[in-house]
UniProtKB/Swiss-Prot annotation:
Disulfide bonds: none annotated. SUPFAM superfamilies: Composite domain of metallo-dependent hydrolases (SSF51338), Metallo-dependent hydrolases (SSF51556). Its cofactor is Mn(2+). It comes from Sinorhizobium fredii (strain NBRC 101917 / NGR234). This is Adenine deaminase. One of its GO terms (biological process) is adenine catabolic process.
Length: 565
């Protein structure tokens, strides 16, 4: 290391040419808010010189451009991009996302520690810096059937891995508040490290109790009022804009220069089609500035404030001694990355090609029994039926009640009120559970949509008008080893295979993007009105997000944390 330090000193002072010098541009100083005209000297993975002129062995002209620190996605599930970590790296790093803090609890719920190890192995090979948080709630609750169980004894061996950053989102906030021994054991083991939160709508003294355990960050705020209370109580708020959960607009009032030290950005769940059409964190930055947010506030949240929230003290500024994660932009407002450096390496196709591949895992994870149309029947009742109310752009659902029509001795859908059937089928080969219910808000007039992506236990979830089409869609998932399927009038009109744990494709992200475009069109042909019907479907079984959900064990009243049917 002493040789490296000597090199850093000599190149920083200018005694020797730097490895790389960016010349002729300006950099955005996130401390003062100034645009500073200066060369930027890089030695190895580190910035060694600013605010002066430098010579370099390689000099790159960035005249007319603005250089900012690399962007940090502070909470995401790479599995929701439907591609491997290697393909995610290739997809978003060119957009300026140089660090991603991921929670692999999707694959962990299916494969357990094998899934976590797959992510850690991948993170050691990617060009972007992928950091892994250890999945805290596998299974998420006792109200569903997962493919794995991760008690604290299975997590602690990973704690000191160089890519591990802490304990991932603690979703079981009722378990924390009610002092569940399993929850407390995990929290106790990670005292002094980073513990990520997940506390939708938690307020008042219950929030105090939750935070008293050492939890410091939260990405579930859906209103400025909720976010402000959590900031007052010492939390960093991770402003989220994913493919389904879109909270940026609601939280813009808190994205100010004064509050920016307590903010960061995240996507949580974002698929390659949305990344291709809109972008990633760069899309959030553009959107916020166009809506009137000060550039200094949003760029701080995208980098230095994010780094500080997670203890990544080596990155987030364009300054000597800091990690050379840099994005060369056309302008602050457009936030279009023209050049990206990750750890001092210029991001190119050739750089990606040098990565070592990681063998896929979980290629035979869909073990569901074959179902028939009759399995989707719901006996008729004259009393009101609980219906899951979908809110576009939200993973929070409403608990609605309706009198539904009789079809013989069965309860039928009510297309006039946009109410169709929903079912969850256990697919890990544990118990063969099957639960049926009703959902409002998808817009379907015919057919069915099915998925093995079903947060967080990732059982098969299917919505539809026709029970025959629902059965065909669910069974087709077994044949393709997991994925998404669209069925119309007895035939499959769209599908994507996700054979890695039933969650991720083996294909390049460009191919996944193109298939997703076709899938959306197939879903829209059924009448689907949701912008992202597949990921919206995937959140119907998530029993840690209010208010009504469905698991393989039945309908879940999340407010009561209990099965109700």
């Amino acid at each position: 290391m002493s040789e490296a330090l000597e090199r850093f000193i000599d190149q920083g002072i200018g005694r020797k040419p730097a490895d790389i010098v960016l010349k002729g541009g300006r950099f955005f100083d996130l401390v003062t808010g100034e645009l500073v005209a200066s060369d930027i000297a890089i030695s190895g993975d580190r910035i060694v010189g600013t605010c002066g002129d430098y010579e370099g062995r390689e000099e790159i002209d960035v005249s007319g451009r603005i250089v900012v620190p690399g962007f940090i996605d502070t909470h995401l599930h790479i599995e929701s991009s439907l591609v491997t970590p290697h393909e995610f790296d290739r997809c978003v790093l060119p957009l300026g996302i140089t660090t991603a803090i991921c929670d692999p609890h999707e694959i962990a719920n299916v494969l357990g520690t094998e899934g976590i190890q797959f992510f850690l192995d991948s993170a050691m090979e990617t060009i972007m810096d992928i950091r892994v948080q250890l999945s805290s709630c596998v299974p998420a609750t006792h109200l569903e059937t997962a493919g794995a169980d991760l008690p604290i004894e299975r997590l602690t061996p990973f704690r000191h891995h160089p890519k591990v950053i802490g304990l991932a989102e603690f979703m079981n906030f009722p378990g924390v508040i009610h002092k569940d021994p399993i929850c407390l054991a995990k929290l106790d083991a990670f005292q002094g490290g980073h513990i990520d939160g997940h506390a939708p709508l938690l307020r008042g003294k219950e929030l105090n109790g939750y935070l008293a355990t050492g939890i410091r960050t939260d990405h579930e705020c859906t209103s400025a009022e909720e976010a402000l209370e959590k900031i007052r109580k010492g939390m960093h708020i991770l402003v989220r804009e994913g493919s389904v959960s879109k909270d940026l607009q609601a939280l813009m009032p808190i994205i100010t220069e004064r509050l920016s030290p307590h903010l960061a950005l995240c996507t949580d769940d974002r698929n390659p089609l949305d990344i291709a059409e809109q972008g990633h964190l760069d899309h959030m930055i553009r959107t916020a500035i166009a809506a009137g947010v000060e550039p200094l506030a949003i760029y701080r949240a995208a980098s230095i404030s994010a780094a500080r929230a997670f203890g990544l003290s080596d990155r987030g500024l364009v300054a000597p001694g800091w990690r050379a994660d840099l994005v060369v932009l056309d302008s602050l407002e457009n936030c279009k990355a023209e050049m990206v450096f990750s750890g001092g390496r210029r991001v190119t196709d050739a750089l990606f090609a040098r990565r070592k591949p990681v063998e896929p895992v979980g290629l035979d994870s869909v073990k569901a029994r074959e179902v028939k149309a009759a399995d989707f029947g719901v006996p008729y009742s004259e009393v009101e039926t609980s219906v899951i109310g979908v809110l576009p752009g939200k993973i929070i659902t409403e608990h609605r009640r309706y009198r539904l029509p009789a079809v013989g001795n069965q309860t039928g859908p009510d297309l006039g009120r946009d109410i169709i059937k929903v079912a969850v089928i256990e697919r890990h080969g544990v118990n063969g559970n099957h639960a049926n219910g009703f959902v409002q808000g998808f817009g379907l007039k015919k057919g069915a949509i099915a998925s093995t992506v079903g947060h967080d236990s990732h059982n098969i979830c299917v919505v539809g008008v026709s029970e025959e089409d629902m059965a065909l869609a669910a069974n087709r998932l077994g044949a393709i080893k997991g994925g998404f399927v669209v069925v119309e009038d007895g035939r499959v009109t769209g599908e994507i295979a996700l054979p890695i744990a039933g969650l991720m494709s083996l294909e390049p992200y460009e191919r996944v993007r193109d298939i997703l475009h076709h899938l959306r069109q197939a879903a829209f042909a059924l009448g689907a009105t949701l912008e992202e019907p597949f990921l919206q479907l995937a959140f119907l079984p998530l029993p840690v997000i209010p208010h009504l959900k469905i698991s393989d064990r039945g309908l879940v009243d999340v407010d009561k944390f209990a099965l109700i049917g």
